[in-house]
């Protein structure tokens, strides 16, 4: 099975470049984040014309089994808008962005329209997800609690890459959709999986993080921001502006697709690296997560050979 992407073609729905979504995966993979596979293809349906498309591996059981132990036995949620139909004919409707808001109930019906179960559907188990939203709502966000429920490194890395790309159409930046939320059966807690990152590399001044309820609470905890600072530094120092590796990769891609109708718009991305550098560096050096180290315990003398600082 595969999902077909028309980015870079006239049918691409205002997604004008072939490599936008692919570069995000290129950033994530060497930094240790699992990503799905993709390849460019020519597709034809019946007696229609050939169309140039990118075929994406779907985020489903095969992907989960390849990347995680007992992967298909984990809990996979697809993130999308919550819709409310307010007329019998369905023509009047309202929508809201998905977020990590606790809805004052443990009933999964309150959550399942924007957090769509995509594995173990018959179990219909939203317990761990609802626990996360409740903890965020009640400000029970100490490091031990969040480390138990989530995978802070993978969440921080995912948010860094999508924020750097100005991927406004996803939950950590501006829109409550276009990602998957996954909790492995064995091992670490909840993490985001990259999906549908084709509206990127355009909004120069887009903030790295958005303000979705619960999401903002999580990522602004100092120990989460510390991880984001680490991954943003790695991204900037090793994979973006003046990165020999990334430039070589783009040159190799340019050669590989020559004559195929696919364009690797290298100059657009190198210009982005230059323009985005300042905002990304400022994100790292903001005061919220860069407080100077200080020992604030009472300055009383001690005769002990070993003391514990708390």
Q: Where in the sequence are the language-model features?
A:
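Alpha-helical scaffold elements adjacent to nucleotide-binding pockets in ATP/GTP-utilizing enzyme cores
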Residues: 23, 55-59, 227
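Internal "kinase-insert"/substrate-recognition segments embedded within catalytic cores
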Residues: 2-11, 17, 30-36, 48-165, ...
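Middle-to-C-terminal accessory/interaction subdomains
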Residues: 13, 111-306
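Alpha-glucan (starch/glycogen) binding determinants
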Residues: 310
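TRNA-binding/sensing appendages of the translation machinery
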Residues: 16-17, 21-28
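Short, well-structured active-site flanking segments
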Residues: 36-37, 174
